[in-house]
Regions:
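Non-transmembrane "mature" sequence context
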Residues: 1-129
Length: 129
């Protein structure tokens, strides 16, 4: 019985995470390639995963990435006004984590550790640290 409940919970968590991520991808106007790479998926998997009837599983790394991206999105929306909140991730940035690169490219290249670093960086900006 517990295994059934855990499976249902896992499926719900995956569905919610993918729905939120799809909305963020749209808000940020990311390409299919960028969205897939940021989530550490192949383009074909992302095409399937963004559909409401997706029944696949995500790895722990992928779920953590999606969670961190939601946090990044939230911080950007709270810290900046539009259009900067929606375009910050795709603009070249001279901040300490980026060295002139786009935060998106930095996140894709650096994987989960860099995505988490970006989230921490934005949370610190928002908190005034």
């Amino acid at each position: 019985m517990q295994l059934v409940a855990e499976t249902r919970d896992s499926a719900r968590i995956t569905a919610v995470a993918l729905k939120a991520y799809a909305r963020i991808v749209e808000a940020w106007a990311l390409s299919l390639k960028e969205a897939a790479a940021l989530a550490d998926m192949s383009e074909s998997t992302w095409k399937r995963a963004r559909k409401p009837d997706f029944s696949g599983d995500l790895t722990k790394d992928q779920l953590l990435r999606l969670s961190a991206v939601v946090g990044i999105y939230k911080s950007l929306e709270l810290y900046f006004s539009d259009p900067l909140a929606r375009t910050w991730i795709t603009r070249p940035n001279t901040g300490p984590l980026f060295g002139g690169a786009r935060p998106l490219d930095s996140a894709i290249e650096g994987g989960l550790p860099q995505i988490l670093a970006i989230r921490t960086y934005l949370d610190a900006l928002r908190g005034g640290a």
